[in-house]
């Protein structure tokens, strides 16, 4: 039986890819830095992300790959290892990577790293599919501490519009691309079903937890100071984040794509549903 290799299998998307494959009866090998704590479905083989380890790529037909590293220097040896044994790779890109734009011309460091990995995969000789998702709905968890503490979320760019996507919708498309025909050599742009500002997202979370919430606008400089004071936020990314938000706020609103329903046959999940699923994370009752 062919085996599917899932990288980042304890992350927001990788876990759901591994679960969906396992529930379908497929053989799954998943990578985790802490295999003993992975808590994946029974039958999933969990290994460390060391492709030089004996048996790591045995019988692997296709791989789901994401890139969590803060550089692209590990990409070439990883792609080289995959291309010697694996027929197909589905890569989840990120950072607002622009298609058909050279890595060095991408708009930010994260996009440059992801574009570098994309280029290596596309030139590897493997069958490939690139998934380019919009903002994860899970990113709203950045506000969870503020919401648990009160009824106001403070931040800059409250009018910034995005098309947030449920992580399980990304996973559903990934499984189709891993297991089905018609996806090789294609880039799938994935969005949720609606365009929402940050302030509107906060309102919908409030509705999900049964408590009115409101957005309080900060200036970019106030937001910079807030992020720099947050021990959980890397100082080196504060400037890049604010610059990126400034550019996004000045750009035309994003468009909703039909890729998720076109591929999966199921409508993309709205934020209201995701927020209800995660109500407990914001101090509400899980529904």
What would you call each of these model-derived segments?
Residues 2-41, 52-55, 60, 66-76, ...:
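Oxidoreductase cofactor-interface core, primarily capturing Rossmann-like NAD(P)-dependent enzymes
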Residues 60-61, 265:
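An amphipathic, basic-hydrophobic alpha-helix
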């Amino acid at each position: 039986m062919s085996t599917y290799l899932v990288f980042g299998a304890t992350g927001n998307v990788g876990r759901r890819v591994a679960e969906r494959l396992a529930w379908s009866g497929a053989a799954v090998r998943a990578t985790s830095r802490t295999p003993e704590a992975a808590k994946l479905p029974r039958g999933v083989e969990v290994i460390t992300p060391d492709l030089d380890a004996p048996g790591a790529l045995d019988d692997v037909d296709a791989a789901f790959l994401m890139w969590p590293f803060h550089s692209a220097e590990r990409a070439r040896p990883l792609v080289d290892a995959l291309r010697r044994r694996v027929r197909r790779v589905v890569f989840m890109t990120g950072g607002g990577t622009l298609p058909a734009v050279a890595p060095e011309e991408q708009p930010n460091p994260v996009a440059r790293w992801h574009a570098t990995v994309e280029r290596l995969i596309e030139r590897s000789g493997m069958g490939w599919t690139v998934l380019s998702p919009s903002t994860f709905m899970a990113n709203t968890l950045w506000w969870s501490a503020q919401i648990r503490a009160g009824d106001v979320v403070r931040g800059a760019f409250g009018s910034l519009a995005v098309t947030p996507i449920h992580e399980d919708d990304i996973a559903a498309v990934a499984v189709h691309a891993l297991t089905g025909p018609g996806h090789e050599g294609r880039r799938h742009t994935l969005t949720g079903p609606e365009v929402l500002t940050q302030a509107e997202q906060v309102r919908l979370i409030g509705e999900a937890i049964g408590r009115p919430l409101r957005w309080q606008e900060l200036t970019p400089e106030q937001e910079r100071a807030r992020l720099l004071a947050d021990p959980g936020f890397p100082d080196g990314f504060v400037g890049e984040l604010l610059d990126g938000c400034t550019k996004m706020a000045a750009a035309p609103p994003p468009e909703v794509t039909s890729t998720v329903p076109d591929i999966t046959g199921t409508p993309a999940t709205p934020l209201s549903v995701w927020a209800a699923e995660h109500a407990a994370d914001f101090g509400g009752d899980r529904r």
